[in-house]
Design a protein with these regions (language model features):
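The feature captures the beta-strand-to-loop junction immediately N-terminal to the Walker
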Residues: 14-16
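Conserved ABC transporter NBD signature motif
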Residues: 33-52
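Conserved ABC ATPase "signature" region
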Residues: 88-107
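Conserved ABC ATPase signature
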Residues: 111-115, 119
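Hydrophobic anchor residue at the start of the ABC signature
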Residues: 125-126, 153
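Catalytic Walker B motif of ABC-type/P-loop ATPase nucleotide-binding domains
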Residues: 136-140
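Helical segment within the ABC ATPase nucleotide-binding domain
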Residues: 150-162
Length: 197
């Protein structure tokens, strides 16, 4: 399997269940052993730190974990801070700014387990982008969100794509084809189809 991701890419990854979409994402993230190579552009690193943000499918997040919405967002900085360093006032301001941008600032202080599925997905998006990654990987980001926020989500992602490459897994090729720059079909093999957008 071979796939090049360029710095301004916005890729929609589609394919049947069991075709390898999640395995492809997990290989890019370095979360599973794989045969072959995953090459990262130098721009994806700051020193030895990988600049990759990830929004998993919501069902992998423990809603019982005792953490506030703001703390959830700030946890996206953990790999980017020194051990035992505290969040700065600027970090907290940035977290609140992202919560406002995604329309959930009013739940900033609530426990993550007390908010709706759509609000959870927005909070996890904020967590994925607070570190300003160079590559953002999203696994079914429109799950659990209403139609109004789904449209806003795609606008936010198009705005973010000015600063980072995006890889988005989705089952809804009809919707994402009008948003992404290229479609990647994964069914044990990878086929990239660039659009004329």
């Amino acid at each position: 399997v071979s796939l090049d991701i360029f710095e301004d890419d916005f890729l929609g990854v589609i394919g049947p269940n069991g075709g390898g979409k999640t395995s492809l994402v997990r290989a890019i993230l370095g979360n599973i052993p794989y045969r072959g190579t995953v090459n990262y552009a130098a721009e994806l690193f700051r020193g030895k730190e990988r600049l990759i943000g990830y929004l998993p499918q919501q069902n992998v997040f423990d809603r019982a974990f005792p953490i506030s919405v703001t703390e959830t967002v700030l946890s996206g900085l953990q790999g980017h801070k020194r051990f035992r360093s505290r969040y700065t006032a600027e970090d907290c301001r940035r977290a609140l700014q992202l919560l406002e941008r995604t329309g959930i600032a009013e739940v900033a202080g609530r426990a993550i387990g007390e908010i709706s599925g759509g609000q959870m997905q927005r909070a996890l998006l904020c967590r994925a982008i607070i570190s300003e990654p160079r590559l953002l990987i999203l696994d079914e980001p429109a799950n659990f969100v209403d139609n109004q926020f789904e449209n806003e989500l795609y606008r936010i992602l198009q705005e973010l794509n000015r600063r980072m490459a995006i890889v988005m897994v989705s089952h809804d090729v009809g919707t994402i084809s009008s948003v992404v720059k290229s479609i990647v079909c994964v069914n044990r093999h990878v086929h990239r189809h660039d659009s004329n957008i």
